[in-house]
């Protein structure tokens, strides 16, 4: 209890020692009348603040009047004010600050009694054990000191006594003193108090709060406010620039539309984004109060390098001078690894730098700022393409596949082997699969140009293919979809379309396949039961493309336009439309059950939204669970041959030689690109660029990175 009492008493302002010295008799007032007048003035001031017995006040007033009439009298009345001052002021100071003001032997030993008194409670700003206690402002105290020194010594002593009394008073007495002073202030003085208090009551709440709460507050700010917060102080900058805050910002905006601000940033590998979330949350609770921990959380606490779709890895590249300067080492800067170990050490960028990079790309997409590169080499129309990192693969009616370096524009190699025009292709890190009008599919080592194997089975030309993991689906002129299983070497056909099947998309998560056909329909197939789960009707022209949207895509139902479109219908082999309308979408179980009994046991549902294009010059956005057409995109003058989509935009190419970029949520055409002299037949879409192929034998790549 003694130590607690000592800590409470030490909670007074750091300038109290100076004030106490000023409160002691100065010794400079040697003339009795001057000393008497000063003490009388002090006593009058104190009693006007604290109040007192009326007889004492009358005695002081009488003596004051007597002194005014007899300024040089040194009678017994001259000693009375000094005694009264000592009687009323000194005991007050001794009671509340005995360590600094009380004479020897007069200090109280009963600490328990002092602490039990309600007057011993200090307000939170003067408790030394509280973090948010306001410290003395050194510049203000220096200014106060200089102004005080300009006054006569008698005035200095009187003012110092008032300060000493207030500094020594507990919370209850302080309020009374302030109320009395405020009651006597005029309007200019009250205005001065208001202006002064406005600044004094401000506290650094981010420093006072625990780090995890400070991060929670900062996560509610937008990017502009965060940057302004970082300019407040070094402490605020450490908090506002921390990975905890900017990881949340990336998670909220990258590859999706933010519901608050409407902004969405280009694609980032969301798997890595989700994997690092737990480490970021742990980092927030273990943040060092003296500043952010160096490389806390290791590799998982940093963002993957968002350079391109699918293969964005935030590994340092010596050729990337622009980003290398902001990358940081994951290991300690003091412990330098061996040269070989340093060579293989992964480097990372702060999440703020990742957001900054994505924001620049997103702004370029919004305003159409891009650079264009043209690839020429094919002797006939380009019908298919795909790009990853700096590799571009194109297939043409000249029966060749060309591999390009997107950075230099150089043709790396040409793959020859098909006997007719190539209508579709897809590649990954190890292989490239192509489909041709010669009814075959070929598997290539695109790095060497070697044809590894050839698959036949269709009775017509192969005009569409898509593989995911171990499943390959091919679409053919023979009106069928063929499924190839690389794992068990099995194959089977999906029959149901009545005309050419132009495009297929495999979803291995739900084990389903989408197909688009010249019979103006889109079908959803179950790979386990080989049954058609859903048929989408609505297009009045041959459907050329179908693209499932990522599962992160969100669409507000109130934005739907085609709810009452009688021409947009759906049919299923196991359910009726009325049953689909009756079943809600309130849970995942309900969402999967609309596709049949095979989805009742927790099997993942197919992608909820798909986008299709047709030769009726329109693009449609569908909801797979109900079969509704949510939105129709109008703008192309002729049939839409090519389509690409992600969570932020839809890119389409048509017979009218134009490429259009759409907002999938509003249906608005954001930008139109021209340049091809023939119909646009294929499109590849990435996070910061897209490529188009045309019957004019050219491929054009638009980059929004620079």
Curated annotation (Swiss-Prot):
WD repeats lie at residues 377-414, 417-456, 458-494, 496-537, 589-632, 635-672, 675-706. InterPro entries: F-box-like_dom_sf (IPR036047), F-box_dom (IPR001810), G-protein_beta_WD-40_rep (IPR020472), SCF_subunit_WD-repeat (IPR051075), WD40/YVTN_repeat-like_dom_sf (IPR015943), WD40_repeat_CS (IPR019775), WD40_repeat_dom_sf (IPR036322), WD40_rpt (IPR001680). Component of the SCF(sconB) E3 ubiquitin ligase complex. Residues 34-43 have a biased composition (Low complexity). Component of the SCF(sconB) E3 ubiquitin ligase complex involved in the regulation of sulfur metabolite repression, probably by mediating the inactivation or degradation of the metR transcription factor. Residues 1-43, 56-76 are annotated as: Disordered. Gene3D superfamilies: 1.20.1280.50, YVTN repeat-like/Quinoprotein amine dehydrogenase. Belongs to the WD repeat MET30/SCONB/SCON-2 family. Residues 203-249 form the F-box domain. This is Probable E3 ubiquitin ligase complex SCF subunit sconB. It comes from the Eukaryota. One of its GO terms (biological process) is protein ubiquitination. The keyword Metal-binding does not apply. CDD domains: F-box_SpPof1-like, WD40. Pathway: Protein modification; protein ubiquitination. Keywords: Repeat, Transcription, Transcription regulation, Ubl conjugation pathway, WD repeat. Residues 1-12 have a biased composition (Basic and acidic residues).
């Amino acid at each position: 209890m003694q130590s607690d009492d000592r800590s409470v008493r030490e909670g007074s302002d750091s300038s109290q020692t100076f004030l106490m010295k000023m409160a002691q008799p100065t010794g400079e007032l040697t003339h009795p009348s001057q000393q008497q007048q000063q003490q009388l003035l002090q006593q009058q001031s104190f009693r006007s603040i604290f109040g007192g017995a009326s007889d004492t006040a009358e005695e002081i007033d009488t003596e004051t009047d007597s002194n005014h009439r007899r300024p040089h009298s040194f009678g017994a009345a001259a000693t009375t004010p000094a005694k009264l001052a000592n009687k009323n002021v000194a005991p007050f100071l001794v009671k509340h600050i005995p360590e600094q003001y009380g004479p020897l032997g007069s200090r109280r030993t009963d600490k328990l009694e002092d602490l039990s008194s309600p007057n011993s409670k200090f307000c939170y700003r003067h408790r030394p054990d509280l973090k948010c206690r306001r410290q003395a402002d050194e510049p203000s105290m220096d200014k106060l000191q200089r102004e005080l020194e300009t006054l006569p010594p008698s005035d200095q002593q009187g003012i110092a006594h008032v300060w000493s009394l207030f500094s020594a008073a507990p919370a209850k007495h302080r309020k009374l003193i302030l109320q009395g002073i405020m009651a006597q202030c005029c309007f200019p003085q009250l205005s001065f108090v208001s202006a002064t208090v406005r600044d004094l009551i401000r506290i650094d709440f981010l420093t006072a709060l625990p780090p995890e709460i400070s991060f929670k507050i900062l996560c509610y700010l937008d990017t502009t406010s965060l940057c302004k917060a970082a300019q407040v102080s070094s402490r605020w900058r450490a908090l506002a620039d921390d990975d905890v805050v900017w990881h949340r910002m990336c998670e909220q905006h990258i590859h999706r539309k933010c519901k608050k601000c409407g902004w969405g940033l280009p694609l980032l590998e969301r798997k890595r984004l989700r994997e690092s979330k737990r480490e970021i949350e742990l980092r927030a609770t273990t943040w060092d109060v003296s500043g952010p921990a160096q490389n806390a959380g290791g590799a998982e606490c940093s963002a993957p390098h968002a350079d391109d779709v699918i293969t964005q890895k935030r590994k340092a590249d010596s050729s990337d001078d622009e980003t290398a300067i902001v990358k940081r080492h994951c290991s300690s800067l003091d412990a330098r690894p061996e040269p070989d170990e340093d060579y293989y050490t992964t480097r990372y960028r702060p999440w703020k730098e990742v957001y900054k990079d994505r924001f620049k790309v997103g702004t370029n997409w919004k305003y159409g700022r891009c650079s264009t590169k043209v690839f020429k080499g094919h002797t006939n129309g380009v019908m298919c393409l795909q790009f990853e990192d700096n590799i571009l693969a194109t297939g043409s009616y000249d029966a060749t596949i060309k591999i390009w370096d997107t950075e230099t524009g150089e043709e790396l190699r040409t793959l020859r082997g098909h006997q007719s025009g190539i209508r579709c292709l897809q590649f990954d890190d190890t292989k490239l699969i192509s489909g041709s009008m010669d009814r075959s599919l070929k598997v290539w080592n695109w790095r060497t140009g070697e044809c590894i194997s050839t698959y036949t089975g269709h009775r017509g030309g192969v005009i569409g293919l898509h593989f995911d993991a171990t499943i390959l689906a091919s679409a053919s002129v023979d009106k069928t979809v063929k499924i190839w299983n690389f794992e068990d070497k099995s194959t089977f056909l999906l029959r149901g379309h009545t005309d050419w099947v132009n495009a297929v998309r495999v979803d291995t998560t739900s084990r389903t396949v989408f197909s688009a056909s010249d019979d103006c329909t889109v079908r959803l197939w179950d790979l386990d039961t080989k049954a058609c789960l859903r048929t989408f009707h609505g297009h009045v022209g041959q459907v050329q493309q179908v693209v499932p949207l990522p599962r992160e895509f969100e669409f507000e139902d109130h934005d739907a336009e085609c709810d009452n479109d009688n021409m947009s219908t759906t049919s299923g082999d196991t359910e009726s439309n009325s049953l689909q309308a009756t079943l809600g979408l309130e849970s995942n179980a309900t969402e999967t059950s609309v596709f049949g009994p095979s989805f009742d046991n927790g099997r993942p549902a197919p992608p909820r939204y798909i986008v299709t294009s047709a030769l009726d010059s329109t693009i449609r956005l569908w909801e797979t669970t109900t079969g509704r057409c949510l939105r129709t995109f109008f703008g192309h003058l002729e049939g839409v041959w090519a389509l690409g989509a992600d969570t932020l935009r839809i890119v389409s190419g048509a017979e009218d030689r134009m490429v259009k970029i759409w907002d999938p949520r509003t249906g608005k055409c954001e930008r139109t690109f021209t340049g091809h002299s023939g119909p646009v037949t294929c499109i590849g879409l990435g996070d910061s660029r897209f490529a188009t192929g045309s019957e004019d034998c050219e491929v054009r790549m638009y980059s929004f990175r620079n």
